[in-house]
Each structure stands twice: as C-alpha cells, then as structure tokens.
Amino acid sequence: MVQQNADRLARIAEEILDIARVKHQISHANSSTIALDGTVAQVWHDWRDQDPARRRGQLHLGAQDIHVEFDPEHLRRVLFNLLDNALRYMGPEEDSLQLSTRVTASGRASVQVWSDGAPLDQSIERHLFEPFFSSESRSSGLGLYICRELCERHGATIDYQRTGRTTQRGDMQGNAFTVSFRKTGRLKEPASLFDTVVV
C-alpha cells in the first residue's frame, strides 16, 4: 500500500511538471499551415508502427487538399492520446477503432477518433476534459485536459459524443472524440498523403 501511494504521488508530480511543460510550449508555439490528410496519415502510421500487433484499426481520409492551422507536433500529441485511450476500450475487430477526417458542407474540417467501446457514464462524461479527473486509479486524468489546452491554443475545439459508425458487423454505436479546426483552406496543388512528415 505504501509503495502504491508513493508511485501514485510520483506520477502526479511528473504529470504536474508535464502540464507546466505543455503550457510553456503552448505559449511559445505558432500555428503552422498543415495538410490535414497528410499529417493525420503520418501520425496514424507512426502510432501503429509502435505496436503493429495490438494497434489495429481503419483510417478514412476525407479532407483531400485541405490545410488547417495547427502545430503538427501538437496535433500528433492530441491524436496519440486519443488513439491510446480508444485502444484500451475497443473491441477485437479490425474496424473497432476508426480514425477519420472530413469536411462539412460549410467547409469546416475535422478529425475524429471513434471506437466501439461501452458508453461512458454521464458522471464521467461531464468531467472528461477536467484536469486530474479519471475513472481509473492508475490514470492521472491529464491526457484529455492537455488535448483541450492544445486545441484551444490553435483555435480548435475538441468534444465527445456517443455516435454510430458503419462497420463490417453493421451499424455500431461507439465513442467519438472530434477535433474541429478553426481555419480551413484548399491547397493549390493536390497533396500526397505523406506531404507532411511528423517526427
């Protein structure tokens, strides 16, 4: 018990320092104009390559030639966090996790991480993006808070909703986290999926 408490305090201390580092990065970072589909595709492949046996899912790109204002490293961090969270609760099927981009009729672009996990309790949903809130004792509850801070820095929004997706098993309900970007424009020339490389 003593060791568990000590480990938990150590994690909290490290994560408080992480918040300070992120806030420093946010205050000194400038938004870049990035090709959305290219950046998302690169992040997806980087994430999967870390553990190909476990990190499975589907990528759907629907924002061809669209660029948005966002720091590529910040978007990478947001997506890694959302994908890691989805991986914990998704089912065993190949399409249990889906990463997608789209552009609305009004021209606003977004990227969404969807998984077929169980619905969130309303008491959890209300506090999702608050610092240090978590439904698990081993989690600090800082991941989604940091995602929100990074999105707000670049004029984007992040939200959660329970929504359906078409899968090989039919229409399924799942948990979706969506980042909607502030500014959207079309590239002058069609962008390759790997025009933007995030390292």
Question: Where are the regions a protein language model picked out?
Answer:
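A conserved beta-strand-to-alpha-helix junction within the catalytic ATP-binding
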Residues: 30-45
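Short alpha-helical Gxxx[C/S/T] motif in the catalytic ATP-binding
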Residues: 143, 147
